[in-house]
Amino acid sequence: MYYEFDDDNIKSSTDKLISSNKIRKNPLFYGPYKVSKVVRGQSVSWVPNEHYYKGKPHLKKITASVITPASVAQSIKSNKFDVTQVSNSQWPNIKGTKGVNFIANIPLSYSYLGFKVGKWDAAKGENVMNKDAKMNNRSLRQAIAYGMNVDQVYKRYSSGLSFRIPTLIPKQFGDYFDKNVKGYTYNIKKGNELLDKAGYKKKGTYRVQPNGKPLTIHLAAMSGSKVQEPIIQNYIQQWKKMGLNVKLTGGRLMEMNSFYDKVQNDSKDVDMFIGAWSLSSEPSPQDLYSAKAPFNYSRFVTKENTDLLNDIDSQKAFNNSYRVKKFHQWQAYMDKEAYVVPVANSYNIYAINNKLTGYSLEPSKSMGGGFPNWYYVGYAK
């Protein structure tokens, strides 16, 4: 038995569905609430879904509004909203606010520094590594990692609510996390030693490549909160202390869409980049770092990496101790090679009106991903 599909008809039907009222105006909802009103770019209102299998939820209406980051602190102080996500840099200004409870969780996510060492081959559906790429030198990558004073940065700019992480497998994954991998702590001296031994000699202020050519490294980084600019400029200054000439791609921080357009398309003016991942509950890194993963933005491909990733997802990995062992080996390998260097994770903090009940981020009482189960959320009179 076989099935034959008309790709053109499927695409036509899909395009029509995407723009149809069934999707845009009157979609089906299976949760406790359904959308009642959308003000484009401003707010979305939700009302109880009369078809929800558990029955009627406790709130008559929920309105989610978009506000600027600069107005978050004042909106919390004035109790304008019942639920507000707090930027860590704003915590000192709002932590004593009356009438609210603060709750937090550590999400399955992390930021990282990636080094471009190849291209994505769309025709073959695979990453192709360039052995002659500027950043395809392990000592250079390790030195750059040692030049990041992550602990100092987040102590100053996030009140300690963001923190350095040592591996690409978060601690929340239990035994799969390798506590013996320590990552790269700030060490300018060690970075300089690595560069010296690798032949990156100083000529004036900056170092040159081992072949004697000038070395300019272009860093792509996203814009964000008001502390993002000083954080990135700090790293650039730390690297300068090591004699590395690092410049921002395009001369400035980029908004998210422009950033990922350049990173995904392997733009020539990106040598390294600071990105971030939100992870699923399955810890396998196959979809982010394998040879055929489009999300492997560094484009590194090695036999050892491929073998370890395949082992992690193999039939043998049904034996948990075997899978734990392979996860640990992979983390140690990635730490050594430094194609992708884990940087930090952060607490997600929410300011909650103290009259709200049932709002919880505990796994057993929430929808996961930092979202409560709104069916249980109510308002105390």
Task: Cite the ranges covered by each PLM segment.
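Short helices/loops that flank or line small-molecule/ion binding pockets
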Residues: 70-81, 92-97, 233-242, 256-270
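Detector for C-terminal structural segments
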Residues: 42-43, 50, 145-178, 227-237, ...
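Ligand-site clamp/hinge motif
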Residues: 21-24, 49-94, 245
